[in-house]
C-alpha cells in the first residue's frame, strides 16, 4: 500500500447495516414496557404457528415479518425482499445472499453481479437511469462498494465472530497468502482494548459492525481508494468530502484525526460523514475500515494471482514489473528531489516501467484489481482504525 509522496489516502470505507438493528432495539423496549404475561402468551402462540410453518417447509411469519427459520427469528434475522440486478433498493433487500442497503443499486454490469467474484453496488440517485452499456459512464459518476462475505457459524455470537479478526499473514504462492491468528500487540483499535474513555466512538462502531456482520453475513468496502475531484496538497482541508469512484485523484495529504482522541477532522471524520447515521435516505452507515475488516477483505480477494504478502505482480510499486495503464492520470515521483510531479493524462496507454514510482488516479488499470476492488496493493498507504497507541 505504499506511496512515495508525502500523503496518505483514506482506506476504503465500510458500509455497516445498522438501521435494522436500531429498529429491533426499539421493538424490544416496547415489549418490556407492555403486559409481560399477555406478551408471553402471544409469543407462545406465534412460536407454535411458526413451528408448524417451518415444519411444512415454508417461510415463517411473525408480527407481519418473514423469517427463514425460528432460529433466524430469535436472532432478529428478518427475511429480506429479493431485488434484481440493476434495481435500486427502496428498503434493505436481498440479492443472491448479500444485503443491498436501502438507497443503493445492484450493478447492471454482468461482471459485477456475482458474490464470489465481487458484487458491486452503486449509490445512484432515485429517478436516475444509468447507462449500464457504457460502464465508464457509471463508474466515474457514482460511489461504489463491494460486498465482503464473512463466515458466521452457529457457535458465533453478535459480540464475537471467529472468522472476523485482525491477523498477520504468511507467504503461500498457491493461495496468495495464509491468514494467521498471530498479531503484534503494538497495534490496537483505539480505546477498544483498554479501560480508557472512548473519545473517538470507534469502540462502539466496532461493536455495531460486529453485530451487523453477525446478522447479515458480511459488510461493504469501498471499491476504490477514497478520491478527490481535484489534486490535493499539504495545505488541503481535512474536512473536504471524498468520493469512491473511478478516475479520481487519490485523497492523500490527510491525517487520521486531529489527535488520537480528537476526530473532528481527518480520515475518521470523513469516513463517518460519508453516510452518517442521521441520513435516513440510506439503510447503511459508514466508518473508517477496521483492522479486522481490512484483513477479511484481503482474505476475500487473495488467490494465486493476487498475493497479499507480495503485491508487486499486481500492485503499483516502484519495483513492479513494467505494465500498461490505459485510463485516468499518472504523476511521476521524482526520486532525485523527493517530489511528486504534476498529474498527466494517459493518452491511449502509458507503460509504467520497473524502477519508476508513480501515483495513479483511482482504478487506472484492471491489472491492479482483484474481485472488483482496485489499488489495494500499492499506490497509497491506507488508514485503518488501528493505531500504535490509544
Stretches with model-predicted labels:
Residues 6-28:
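N-terminal single-pass transmembrane signal-anchor helix
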Residues 28, 151-155, 224-228, 293, ...:
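Acidic glycine-/aspartate-rich tracts in secreted/extracellular proteins
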Residues 30-53:
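Aliphatic-rich helix starts adjacent to a transmembrane/signal segment
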Residues 51-68:
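Short extracytoplasmic
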Residues 69-149, 153-158, 286:
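GGW-centered surface loops in extracellular recognition modules
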Residues 135-142, 173-376:
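Short aromatic-cysteine micro-motif
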Residues 154-163, 228-234:
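Short, solvent-exposed loop/turn elements at domain surfaces
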Residues 381-382:
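Generic structural signal for well-ordered beta-strand positions
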Amino acid at each position: 500500500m505504499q506511496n512515495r509522496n508525502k500523503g496518505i489516502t483514506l482506506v476504503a470505507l465500510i458500509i455497516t447495516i445498522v438501521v435494522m438493528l436500531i429498529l429491533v432495539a426499539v421493538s424490544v423496549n416496547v415489549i418490556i414496557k407492555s403486559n409481560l404475561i399477555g406478551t408471553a402468551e402471544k409469543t407462545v402462540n406465534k412460536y407454535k404457528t411458526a413451528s408448524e410453518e417451518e415444519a411444512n417447509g415454508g417461510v415463517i411469519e411473525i408480527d407481519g415479518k418473514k423469517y427463514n427459520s425460528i432460529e433466524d427469528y430469535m436472532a432478529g434475522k428478518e427475511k429480506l425482499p429479493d431485488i434484481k440486478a440493476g434495481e435500486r433498493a427502496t428498503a434493505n433487500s436481498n440479492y443472491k445472499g448479500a444485503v443491498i442497503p436501502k438507497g443503493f443499486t445492484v450493478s447492471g454490469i454482468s461482471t459485477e453481479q456475482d458474490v464470489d467474484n465481487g458484487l458491486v453496488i452503486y449509490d445512484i440517485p432515485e429517478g436516475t437511469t444509468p447507462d449500464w452499456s457504457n460502464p465508464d459512464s457509471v463508474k466515474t459518476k457514482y460511489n461504489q462498494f463491494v460486498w465482503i462475505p464473512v463466515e458466521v457459524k452457529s457457535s458465533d455470537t453478535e459480540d464475537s465472530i471467529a472468522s472476523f479478526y485482525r491477523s498477520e499473514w504468511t507467504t503461500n504462492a498457491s493461495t496468495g497468502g495464509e491468514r494467521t491468528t498471530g498479531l503484534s500487540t503494538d497495534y490496537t483499535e483505539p480505546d477498544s482494548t483498554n479501560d480508557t474513555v472512548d473519545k473517538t466512538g470507534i469502540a462502539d462502531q466496532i461493536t455495531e459492525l460486529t453485530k451487523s456482520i453477525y446478522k447479515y453475513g458480511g459488510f461493504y468496502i469501498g471499491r476504490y481508494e477514497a478520491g478527490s475531484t481535484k489534486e490535493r496538497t499539504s495545505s488541503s482541508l481535512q474536512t473536504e468530502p471524498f468520493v469512491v469512484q473511478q478516475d479520481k485523484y487519490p485523497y492523500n495529504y490527510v491525517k487520521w484525526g486531529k489527535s488520537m482522541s480528537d476526530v473532528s477532522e481527518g480520515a475518521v471524520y470523513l469516513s463517518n460523514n460519508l453516510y452518517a447515521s442521521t441520513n435516513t435516505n440510506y439503510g447503511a452507515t459508514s466508518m473508517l475500515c477496521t483492522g479486522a475488516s481490512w484483513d477479511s477483505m484481503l482474505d476475500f480477494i487473495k488467490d494465486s494471482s493476487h498475493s497479499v504478502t507480495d503485491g508487486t505482480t499486481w500492485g503499483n510499486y516502484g519495483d513492479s514489473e513494467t505494465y500498461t495503464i490505459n485510463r485516468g492520470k499518472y504523476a511521476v515521483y521524482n526520486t532525485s528531489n523527493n517530489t511528486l510531479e504534476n498529474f498527466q493524462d494517459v493518452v491511449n496507454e502509458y507503460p509504467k516501467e520497473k524502477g519508476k514510482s508513480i501515483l495513479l488516479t483511482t482504478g487506472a488499470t484492471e491489472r491492479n484489481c482483484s474481485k472488483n476492488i482496485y489499488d489495494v496493493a500499492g499506490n497509497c498507504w491506507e488508514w485503518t482504525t488501528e493505531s500504535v497507541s490509544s
